[in-house]
Amino acid sequence: MKTFTLIAILTCAVFVIFHAAAAEELEAQDVIETEALATLDEERLFECSFSCDIKKNGKPCKGSGEKKCSGGWRCKMNFCVKV
């Protein structure tokens, strides 16, 4: 009976250790993905600002000195789009 109890306790301990390790790994992956998304968003903002500086159909997408598109223009997929 003592052997069975010892085996059960050791099995539970191993299960808890593996579960904790898996949880840490998933948490680490979540943090990495979040950082990657933040970087991607910053890159998109930069690309959007850059593309809106380009003139489309002879008209600027945004006024000089403005940080956002105006005059009915919006940045979509790195292009100036008339709304």
Swiss-Prot record:
Tissue: Expressed by the venom gland.
Proregion positions: 24-44
Annotated signal sequence range: 1-23
Family recorded in the similarity comment: Belongs to the neurotoxin 12 (Hwtx-2) family. 03 (juruin) subfamily.
Record has Nucleus as a keyword: no
Domain of life: Eukaryota
Pfam families: Toxin_20
GO molecular function: ion channel regulator activity; toxin activity
SS bond list: 48-61, 52-75, 69-80
Record-linked PROSITE patterns: HWTX_2
Cell compartments where the protein resides: Secreted
The protein's name in its UniProt record: U3-theraphotoxin-Cg1a
GO cellular component: extracellular region
Function: Probable ion channel inhibitor.
Keywords for the protein's UniProt record, in alphabetical order: Disulfide bond, Ion channel impairing toxin, Knottin, Secreted, Signal, Toxin
Lineage: Eukaryota, Metazoa, Ecdysozoa, Arthropoda, Chelicerata
Main subcellular location: secreted
Organism: Chilobrachys guangxiensis (Chinese earth tiger tarantula)
